[in-house]
């Protein structure tokens, strides 16, 4: 990997601000806010046991935030859902790639201390925004292979951009 440019770091800060505002409106408490040196960390205090169900819940939360906020330039890191991930030691240098004027090594730092503990109900609520595969039901005659979204959008002249990840496809109108 390489260090982020000043422009990329600024884009990460802007995205972090959007996510912060969204989660605050959603009911989340104030997080610890930090700059990793290459991006932004929003660390929410939650009291969850270290078990498979809670790991899945956190993974879905990050997938939801990725779906809602990631762009071509800035991505939500979806890999930090398990308790065994090592957290940045703030106050140390972020040494990624070569230290160049365009992509300098920076010192990570805490920008704001956290507010309170975020209740699990807000994590669960956030996960409801993640699309679920619809199951065929007798009442809805759902047959996924019969509907082609791209063909339908093209037929009606609706412009879109398609963003694909390993987990889903997002159509931005």
Role assignments for model-derived ranges:
Residues 101-146:
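Long, charge-rich alpha-helical interaction segments
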Residues 34-37, 81, 165-166:
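A short beta-turn/loop motif at secondary-structure boundaries
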Residues 1-38, 45-67, 132-149, 158-161:
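Signature for HUH/AEP ssDNA processing cores
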Residues 31, 40, 84-87, 108, ...:
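A broad, low-specificity signal marking well-ordered, structured residues that form hydrophobic/aromatic
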Residues 1-10, 85, 93-96, 106, ...:
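DNA replication initiation on ssDNA origins
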Residues 156-173:
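N-terminal single-stranded DNA-binding subdomain of primase/primase-helicase replication proteins
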Residues 41-50, 75-102:
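Short, conserved secondary-structure transition motifs
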Residues 65-79:
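Conserved His + Asp/Glu catalytic blocks
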């Amino acid at each position: 990997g390489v260090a982020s440019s000043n422009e990329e770091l600024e884009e990460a800060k802007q995205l972090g601000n959007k996510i912060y505002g969204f989660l605050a409106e959603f009911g989340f408490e104030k997080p610890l806010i930090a700059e990793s040196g290459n991006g932004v960390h929003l660390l929410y205090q939650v009291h969850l046991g270290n078990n498979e169900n809670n790991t899945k819940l956190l993974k879905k939360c990050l997938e939801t935030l990725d779906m809602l906020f990631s762009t071509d330039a800035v991505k939500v890191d979806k890999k930090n859902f398990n308790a065994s991930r090592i957290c940045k030691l703030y106050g140390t240098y972020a040494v990624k790639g070569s230290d160049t004027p365009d992509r300098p090594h920076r010192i990570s730092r805490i920008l704001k201390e956290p507010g309170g503990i975020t209740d699990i109900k807000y994590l669960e609520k956030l996960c409801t925004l993640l699309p679920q595969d619809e199951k065929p039901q007798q009442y809805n005659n759902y047959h996924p292979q019969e509907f082609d979204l791209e063909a339908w959008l093209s037929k009606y002249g609706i412009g879109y951009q398609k963003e694909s990840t390993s987990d889903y496809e997002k159509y931005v109108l």
